[in-house]
Amino acid sequence: MTNKTPADLIVSARWILPVRPTGRLYEHCALVIRDGNIIEIVPTSGIDSQFDYQEHIDLPNQLLMPGLINMHGHAAMSLFRGLADDLPLMEWLQDHIWPAEGEWVDEQFVLDGTQLAMAEMLLSGTTCFSDMYFYPEAAAGAAFEAGMRAQINFPILDFPTQWGSGPEDYIHKGLKLHDNYRSVDLINIGFGPHAPYTVSDEPLKRIAVLAEELQAPIQIHMHETAQEVSDSIANFGVRPLQRIADLGLLGPATQLVHMTQIDEQDIALLTTYSAHVVHCPESNLKLASGFCPVHTLQEHCINTCLGTDGAASNNDLSLFDEMHTASLLGKGVAQRADALKSDTAIEMATINAATAMGLDNIVGSLEKGKRADFIAIDFSNLQQAPIYNLKSHLVNTHVSHLVTHVWVDGKCLVAERELQTLDTKDIYSKACAWQVKIQAQRASGK
């Protein structure tokens, strides 16, 4: 007879950064996991006497922290990485990306591109991602098979694409997808109206009603450029954020991507409706779209999180790099060295993102009772020495390549920097094959 507590997995490490409670850092402790849940965080010295465990992984040089959550991207667009650079948003979209999508995007493209993106995200510490792209059923299936947590937002536009004929068709297909994944814990289906300038009033009203009925998230590009805002004022008499508020689309389940153009009226709306802002600093910088005033948002207690956007406009999917850029940019925009500190940047990529997704009760921090989504980072490197401030190192020393292990729901998806549920060679081979086809078509001028 034993009084030991049963456990499936124990992972011990030099440090554990739980994110919540704020300011806590465990040293020489271990995460104890059973049935995909964190059941304890205890000193490593006591695990043998307290637990009857199936597996123990000791990582003496590593930091454990919550898995990162990429709040906005277009995963399959990784196959368009570097296709068109050094261009403003609308020229980039209209002259390069939309024509390429019309030529190449189908279900196989989305499957292959999503697998490429997931491989990159997992290897750099992302355990959960929000996606908005065509053929969302392919992305959802790929995420489920890989064991990643995901919010898949089905696209809605006024005009036809290869995935649908118009708003009614997009919504019909999206609702079917939502039904298919209703009981799948790892995959959440949301509404993805592309932008205020590509979706008209009636579809936006319907989305608002349906999302409320289904308790589903809404993710939309919003205030990405100054032109978007000025066009809305010219065409509708109000700024885009006010327009979607008037249509019933703004609320605590709404995730607003970019928000580089913000005035006092916008701040008031965001506060009143408890909407979330997704900051994509590297994409905004690359497309010269503007600067999201993150420090101002946070001063008004507006939940702000991080996304990479797609690799076609970034051009990588490293959230650690995004944290670094966000922190530096936040200081520059606010003209305050104490703006967007390392703690804040880490929260934006973890608990804030989980809050925006409505998942902060299960992920986003390492706490007893939450799901075991966490990563390990090796700090036994020259570029991390000496270690005075771990959180500063996480944000400021480019650690994405130092991720050694990744767990989602207690399952190991990366071990010793090797993918466990995705085939690296196959993914790379398919990406190269797409490159050959796309380059040949572009060279022919067809």
Curated annotation (Swiss-Prot):
Organism phylogeny: Bacteria, Pseudomonadati, Pseudomonadota, Gammaproteobacteria, Cellvibrionales
Binding site for Zn(2+): 72, 74, 221, 309
Cofactor: how and how many bound: Binds 1 zinc ion per subunit.
Role noted for this protein: Catalyzes the deamination of 5-methylthioadenosine and S-adenosyl-L-homocysteine into 5-methylthioinosine and S-inosyl-L-homocysteine, respectively. Is also able to deaminate adenosine.
Enzyme class: hydrolase
Entry EC number(s): 3.5.4.28, 3.5.4.31
Obligatory cofactor(s): Zn(2+)
Keywords: Hydrolase, Metal-binding, Zinc
Binding site for substrate: 101, 194, 224, 309
Name of the molecule in the record: 5-methylthioadenosine/S-adenosylhomocysteine deaminase
Catalysed reactions listed for this entry: S-adenosyl-L-homocysteine + H2O + H(+) = S-inosyl-L-homocysteine + NH4(+); S-methyl-5'-thioadenosine + H2O + H(+) = S-methyl-5'-thioinosine + NH4(+)
Keyword Coiled coil appears in the UniProt entry: no
GO MF term set: 5'-methylthioadenosine deaminase activity; metal ion binding; S-adenosylhomocysteine deaminase activity
HAMAP family: MTA_SAH_deamin
Annotated InterPro entries: Amidohydro-rel, Deaminase_MtaD/DadD, Metal-dep_hydrolase_composite, Metal_Hydrolase, MTA/SAH_deaminase
Family recorded in the similarity comment: Belongs to the metallo-dependent hydrolases superfamily. MTA/SAH deaminase family.
Alphabetized Pfam families for the sequence: Amidohydro_1 (PF01979)
Coiled coil: none
